[in-house]
Every structure is written in structure tokens, then in C-alpha cells.
A protein has these predicted regions:
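Sec-type signal peptide cleavage vicinity
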Residues: 4, 17-267
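Sec-dependent bacterial lipoprotein signal peptides
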Residues: 1-15
Length: 267
């Protein structure tokens, strides 16, 4: 009986010591990720148009989506949301607060090294680029990444502020080559890039066209509208700043167009 009691006490002590060790060593814990996308600007665009309008833009992440993530200035590694629970001891840092950086879509191998020598990469517009950050105390159970859009989605609307489904073909003539800072996600149009024609997709085509952030000056011809085989230039009446995460809503009228109800276009 005494032997059993001693064994029980020894086992209890061992279990208690293990618990204390785990509490004292947060690096041994695993943690999970949650990832969300800031949709405020998209929501504002929808509210100005129609409460029932939905856009083919990335508005949330699903289990199985792959992002590229860097923790504590380390290289970017692919991470599958909802499928992996990394351990804190895999992060080589003594800091109590750890900063995470993430890109979506996943980065290619040639730019996954996080260093000043590979800080920038060239990109082509047209699709969405998202960047997220989070800070968490080492040993936390959850790390919540918040993503923002780094590009400018374009929404084609009709006179009633509904998705445009007419026969007009809209092409914008803007810079479509850019440079991204992989440390903070910021994208700028390449200063040496020449404008090129960019086909603007309708909402019904399943994916929005995304532009690169850039400044457009009043009086510039920024594209064309083709209706019934007739091509008309699109001319900007005021300066426009295309800013990341802020959609451009172009309403097509019979004789003119409007960008975001503020900047008129002439045709």
C-alpha cells in the first residue's frame, strides 16, 4: 500500500513539474493563426451602389489557402491556413513580442528570403495583392493576421449603380508594371514603366481587374471605351490618386462616365 502511495505521489509530482515547465517555457507551445481581410473600403463601395451587390474579390480566407509568412524578420515560408499549428520554438528569437508579416498570394521562392538584398520585387498589375501583419506575445495561443489590399480594384457600374452588363469594352491606359516592398507590402508603379492598355473586367466575369497605385493628372487620356465598334477616348477632368485598398467605381453613362461620383471622365 505504501509503495502504491509513493508511486502515486511521485507521478503526481512529475506531472505537476511538467505543467510548471510548460507554463514557464512558452516556446514549447503550439499556436494557431486566424487571418482576416480589411473589407471596409469594399463595403463602402457596395453601400454607395447596392446593398445586394457582391464583388468577386477576396473578402475572407478559407482553410487550405496558402500564404507566405515571416516571423521575427526570418525568411518567408508557405503556411496553409487552418491546416498547420506551428510551435513557438520554431521561431528563432528571444523577443517577448513577435511580429509576423504575410503575403497573399504566396511568394515565389526567388523572393522568399527576407533581407535588404531582396527587399523589392517587380510585379505586374491585374490581380489582387494582399499584405498582413500581426504582433503577439511569445507563448500566445492565437495570432490574428489582418490583411489589407495593396492594389486598386476597378468596379464597372451602369447608370443605376448596378453591375454593368452592356456591350461596351473598357480599356484603361495606365502603368501596369510596379515594384513591391516586401517588408511592408507597399506597391508603387515603376517610375520608368510606360502606360499600357489594361482590359477592365465586368463583375460577371468572375474576377475584378486591379490597378497599381499611381497618380493621374487632369487632362490625360487614360483609356478608351469601345461601343458598337466605335472607339472613344477616356479623358480625366481632375487629378486622381489611385490609392491601395480603395476601389475605383466607374459608372458608364450614355455620354460620360463618373469615377466614384467625384471625378468626371469625358468621352
Amino acid at each position: 500500500m505504501k509503495k502504491n502511495l509513493l508511486f502515486f505521489l511521485a507521478a503526481s509530482c512529475l506531472f505537476s513539474c511538467q505543467q510548471q515547465d510548460e507554463q514557464q517555457e512558452p516556446s514549447k507551445k503550439t499556436f494557431s493563426f486566424s487571418a482576416s481581410i480589411d473589407n471596409e473600403s469594399i463595403t463602402d463601395a457596395l453601400t454607395r451602389s447596392s446593398s445586394t451587390l457582391s464583388l468577386p474579390a477576396k473578402s475572407s480566407f478559407s482553410d487550405g489557402d496558402v500564404i507566405s509568412m515571416s516571423a521575427s524578420e526570418q525568411d518567408y515560408l508557405p503556411f496553409t491556413i487552418g491546416m498547420e499549428n506551428p510551435a513557438w520554438d520554431a521561431i528563432d528569437t528571444d523577443a517577448e513580442a513577435v511580429t509576423f508579416y504575410a503575403h497573399y498570394p504566396e511568394l515565389s521562392d526567388d523572393v522568399a528570403t527576407r533581407s535588404f538584398g531582396s527587399r523589392y520585387r517587380g510585379i505586374t498589375g491585374g490581380k489582387e495583392f494582399l499584405f498582413g501583419m500581426a504582433q503577439a506575445a511569445k507563448g500566445s495561443w492565437n495570432v490574428a493576421l489582418k490583411f489589407k489590399r495593396m492594389t486598386v480594384p476597378v468596379i464597372l457600374l451602369d447608370e443605376k449603380r448596378q453591375p454593368y452588363e452592356g456591350s461596351a469594352i473598357v480599356k484603361l491606359f495606365l502603368k501596369n508594371k510596379g515594384v513591391q516592398d516586401l517588408f511592408n507590402g507597399k506597391i508603387e508603379a515603376d517610375k520608368d514603366a510606360k502606360p499600357e492598355y489594361i482590359n477592365i473586367r465586368k463583375i460577371s466575369e468572375g474576377i475584378l481587374t486591379n490597378l497599381l497605385p499611381q497618380r493621374i493628372k487632369a487632362g490625360e487620356t487614360i483609356g478608351t471605351v469601345i461601343v458598337d465598334d466605335k472607339e472613344e477616348p477616356i479623358i480625366v477632368d481632375e487629378d486622381i490618386e489611385l490609392t491601395p485598398d480603395t476601389p475605383v467605381a466607374i459608372s458608364l453613362y450614355r455620354g460620360r462616365g463618373i469615377i466614384d461620383e467625384r471625378t468626371p471622365l469625358r468621352r
